[in-house]
From Swiss-Prot:
It comes from Streptococcus pyogenes serotype M4 (strain MGAS10750). It comes from the Bacteria. Fe cation binds at H114, H118, D301. GO terms for molecular function: iron ion binding; N(6)-L-threonylcarbamoyladenine synthase activity. This is tRNA N6-adenosine threonylcarbamoyltransferase. It catalyses: L-threonylcarbamoyladenylate + adenosine(37) in tRNA = N(6)-L-threonylcarbamoyladenosine(37) in tRNA + AMP + H(+). Required for the formation of a threonylcarbamoyl group on adenosine at position 37 (t(6)A37) in tRNAs that read codons beginning with adenine. Is involved in the transfer of the threonylcarbamoyl moiety of threonylcarbamoyl-AMP (TC-AMP) to the N6 group of A37, together with TsaE and TsaB. TsaD likely plays a direct catalytic role in this reaction. GO terms for biological process: tRNA threonylcarbamoyladenosine modification. NCBIfam families: gcp_kae1, T6A_TsaD_YgjD.
């Protein structure tokens, strides 16, 4: 059997990444050019700055990924690219580069949903067992997804307002923490106690929707009022209390989803899946079903996860033509108009 190599491109936000996947789940390279330092002074991602950085480094990422993998363009079987959701300018840079590379090398083009990439990052660790439930938690998304078979995604619950990662960054900014704040809040939370009361929105309601705007507002109001009155707040306890509220919500909704759908596995993925507090709670409270969380290096945005998702689409011969365009608000159940089913 001839080995299959997929080159994947990811540029949906502030990471430029190119990866090479061998066959189903062996990552030969996963080059990531991070822009975090460029965005820190702004306290968040500036879309125009992100796009310019992508343009500056993407060619080098292609070269480095191929060199690290020890293959050439002639060895490749396909090119995969994130076409949404994400920042439209950032997406267009990766999309243009991937399309040009695929066209120049006569390779099929595989369109990949960014969130499907996060979910399928777990495939690098072990084969996924279907049907499964996925909890996807990142800076832009908080979703519960039912996956009856590979590549078939059904959103069964999502946030009505802020994503969980967005809430972390916003309260981190209020506390004067460095962007992105999730890791620092997690570390501080482990040193503190859950002493401040924060709301757990919709935690007892029967549906599978999330809401974090009320929690974020309650945190900001507490911090603001204490500052106005000259009251001292204990940073570690603030972080522990905020994180306890977040994790209570995530665990409650995930347990409800598992009780309603015939899942054989739970996948937890996305940037917030790197949170040690979340990992600890999952290990303690969900023991009746196997829980798979990608390795830390695959939790954030990276092209390796896009390649792992693309392998599923390659098996189905789901290719796109060169009219493929960026879809910044792409949903799980959307497919490109330019799909060519062979």
């Amino acid at each position: 059997m001839t080995d299959r190599y997929i080159l994947a491109v990811e540029s949906s936000c502030d990471e430029t990444s190119v990866a090479i996947l061998k066959n189903e789940s062996t990552l030969l390279s996963n080059v990531i050019a991070s822009q975090v330092e460029s965005h820190k002074r702004f306290g968040g991602v500036v879309p125009e700055v992100a796009s310019r950085h992508h343009v500056e480094v993407i060619t080098t990422c292609f070269e480095d990924a191929l060199q690290e993998a020890g293959i050439s363009a002639s060895d490749l079987s396909a090119v995969a690219v994130t076409y949404g959701p994400g920042l439209v300018g950032a997406l267009l840079v990766g999309l243009a580069a991937a399309k040009a590379f695929a066209w120049a090398n006569h390779l099929p083009l595989i369109p990949v949903n960014h969130m499907a990439g996060h979910l399928m990052a777990a495939r690098e660790q072990k084969p996924l067992v279907y049907p499964l439930i996925a909890l996807l938690v990142s800076g832009g998304h908080t979703e519960l997804v039912y996956v009856p078979e590979p590549g078939d995604y059904h959103i069964i619950g999502e946030t009505r307002d802020d994503a969980v990662g967005e809430a972390y960054d916003k309260v981190g900014r209020v506390m004067g923490l460095t962007y992105p704040a999730g890791r620092e809040i997690d570390q501080l939370a482990h040193k503190g106690q859950d002493t401040y009361h924060f709301p757990r929105a919709m935690i007892t309601e029967d549906h599978l929707e999330f809401s974090f705007s009320g929690l974020k507002s309650a945190f900001i109001n507490l911090h603001h009022n204490a500052k106005q009155k000259g009251n001292e707040l204990i940073l570690e306890d603030l972080c522990a209390s905020f994180q306890a509220a977040v994790l209570d919500i995530l665990l409650a909704k995930t347990k409800k989803a598992l009780s309603r759908y015939p899942a054989k596995m739970l996948v937890v993925a996305g940037g917030v899946a790197a949170n040690q507090g979340l990992r600890d709670r999952l290990a303690q409270e969900i023991t009746h079903i196997e829980v798979v969380i990608p390795k830390l290096r695959l939790c954030g945005d990276n092209a390796g996860m896009i390649a792992l998702a693309a392998a599923i689409e390659y098996d189905k011969q789901h290719f796109a033509n060169m009219s493929l365009n960026a879809k910044p608000s792409l949903a799980f159940d959307q497919f490109p108009d330019s799909f060519v089913i062979n």
